[in-house]
From Swiss-Prot:
Protein family per UniProt: Belongs to the bacterial ribosomal protein bS18 family.
Family annotation (InterPro entries): Ribosomal_bS18, Ribosomal_bS18_CS, Ribosomal_bS18_sf
Designated name of the protein: Small ribosomal subunit protein bS18
One Gene Ontology cellular component annotation held by this UniProt entry: cytosolic small ribosomal subunit
Length: 76
């Protein structure tokens, strides 16, 4: 009977001592968006609630300013 050991998730923003998430930092934001364009939940990424709220706001601002797409490219 095999038991799987699940690795402890940690908050990347806490480890790097980030004060505020910037909507212009697209490389960071892209890491928290699925390939369909949805925001990945914190239970998957391990992000703390404070940073998850900042992340969602930053992604929504970047989408509004056309820095990030709302959805995927639909395979054209």
């Amino acid at each position: 009977m095999a038991r799987f050991f699940r690795r402890r998730k940690f908050c990347r923003f806490t480890a790097e001592d980030v004060k505020e998430i910037d909507f212009k930092d697209l490389n960071t934001l892209k890491a928290y968006i699925s390939e369909t364009g949805k925001i990945v939940p914190s239970r998957i990424t391990g992000t703390k609630a404070r940073y998850q709220r900042q992340l969602a706001t930053a992604i929504k601002r970047a989408r509004f300013l056309a820095l990030l797409p709302y959805t995927d490219s639909h395979g054209r």
